[in-house]
A protein has these predicted regions:
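Flexible, membrane-associating and regulatory peripheral segments of lipid-active enzymes
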Residues: 1-27, 31-185
Length: 185
């Protein structure tokens, strides 16, 4: 803790060196968590490049914690730390996507690149289902909304960032369009 408080950069370098020498789930978790905290600090201070880098480090190390073959024997899905890493992965991914997307809008069919000192990720916003990417204007983050009047709340836990697809107004005036709400999602 003292090393982190006095020089976070040296602390990260030390932890990363130890992780590279011997992948350890606790060290990977610590690196992911500290990187996420530093990303939040950098974003708040307007250092968006640094924030993106820290979120990327948190994202990649969280991913390694969850899926690396090196940790297969020690990983325990029932350990509360495992759930915390799942949350850290999701939060890092969402914050990374927010920084990559203008006005917090992810465009269908667009590819986003995330580069960290460790690796590069390519994230593609893909459509699944019968509607094509040209039928949507943008995606929005579900976490930007709060349900206030529905009594039933259905939550599915897992990895990823839930999005809302906002439909474009069609160019041709189909008679059925009058029955659709504006910005139908």
């Amino acid at each position: 803790e003292d090393r982190y408080q006095s020089d976070p950069g040296k602390c990260f370098a030390h932890i990363r060196k130890r992780v590279n020498e011997h992948p350890d789930s606790d060290l990977i978790y610590a690196l992911s968590e500290l990187s996420y905290v530093e990303g939040k600090k950098a974003e708040k201070e307007g250092r968006l490049g640094d924030a993106l880098n820290h979120y990327g480090i948190s994202l990649t190390n969280s991913y390694d914690y969850l899926f690396s073959d090196d940790l297969e024997d020690t990983r325990n899905a029932y350990d509360p730390q495992f759930r915390a890493v799942c949350d850290l992965y999701n939060e890092s991914l969402e914050d990374t996507l927010r920084l990559l997307c203008t006005d917090n809008k992810i465009e269908p069919g667009k590819t986003y690149r995330i580069e960290t000192p460790d690796r590069e990720f390519v994230v593609r916003a893909e459509m699944r289902g019968q509607w094509g990417p040209d039928e949507f204007d943008h995606y929005e983050f579900v976490s930007d909304y709060e349900i206030e009047t529905l009594r039933n709340r259905h939550t599915t836990f897992g990895l990823g960032v839930p999005l809302i697809a906002v439909r474009k107004a069609p160019a041709d005036a189909d008679e059925r369009e009058k029955y659709y709400a504006e910005g139908l999602s």
